[in-house]
């Protein structure tokens, strides 16, 4: 079982003040150690997956080495992000040009469920990177590994059993990637189907076995990062949001 760091209360991490966020993370570490006897997790799950580069300093000071982010907040920073309106398109503010980087996604695919979806660059949006924060008062740099959850695929996975065909666009779009893409399923499991016994004991098991027969390797975040370390030079910008 992989344990994540979380908060004592359900806050939007991205807007919490440094000292308050640090106190909550430390409290979670303390209570986790009391419950499980130790707390060795180096990973962080921000509530609602709401992340901001402004919290990187706090996370590193708490001994956190990596955090989950939403992969839509990588895709929306790319200079060739394809704006799409209506079903499966942008249903929130358009990407802020201040967040735009010169990098291009080049290979894109669009997907939606229940009219909600997005545009994702492959393999860019399915690879862990480094992200950094520079303290404006001291100019000190803080860096952390960011691990993108698969927004669209997680939504599908959270509501019904899925097949490995869901991964086909990602596999097809990443034949020359130096690191294999990581498709991270993460969702509000208890809010839908993806959190009960049939999900964990049947769907996850069946999907994992089917993926293995196609040469896809089931893994955990720590194992992936150990097998495929993120180069310190692979620094990206992450758009604020969840």
In which residue ranges do the predicted regions lie?
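Generic structural signal for well-ordered alpha-helices
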Residues: 22-32, 56, 171, 204-208
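His/Asp/Glu-enriched short active-site or ligand-binding loop at hydrolase and phosphoryl-transfer sites
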Residues: 65-79
């Amino acid at each position: 079982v992989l344990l994540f760091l979380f908060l004592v209360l359900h806050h939007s991490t991205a807007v919490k003040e440094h000292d308050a966020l640090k106190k909550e993370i430390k409290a979670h570490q303390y209570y986790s150690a009391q419950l499980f006897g130790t707390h060795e997790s180096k990973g962080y799950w921000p509530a609602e997956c709401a992340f901001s580069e402004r919290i990187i300093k706090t996370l590193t000071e708490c001994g956190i080495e990596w955090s989950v982010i939403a992969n839509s907040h990588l895709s929306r920073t790319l200079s060739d992000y394809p704006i799409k309106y209506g079903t499966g398109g942008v249903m929130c503010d358009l990407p802020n040009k201040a967040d735009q980087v010169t990098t291009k996604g080049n290979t894109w695919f669009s997907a939606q469920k229940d009219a909600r979806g997005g545009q994702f660059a492959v393999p860019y949006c399915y690879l862990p990177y480094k992200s950094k924060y520079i303290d404006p008062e001291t100019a000190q740099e803080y860096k952390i590994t960011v691990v993108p959850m698969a927004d669209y695929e997680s939504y599908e996975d959270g509501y019904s059993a899925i097949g490995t065909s869901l991964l086909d666009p990602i596999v097809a779009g990443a034949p020359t990637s130096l690191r294999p893409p990581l498709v991270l399923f993460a969702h509000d499991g208890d809010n839908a189907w993806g959190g009960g016994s049939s999900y964990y004991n049947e769907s996850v098991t069946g999907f994992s076995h089917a993926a293995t027969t196609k040469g896809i390797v089931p893994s955990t975040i720590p194992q992936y990062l150990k097998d495929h370390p993120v180069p310190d030079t692979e620094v990206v910008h992450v758009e604020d949001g969840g």
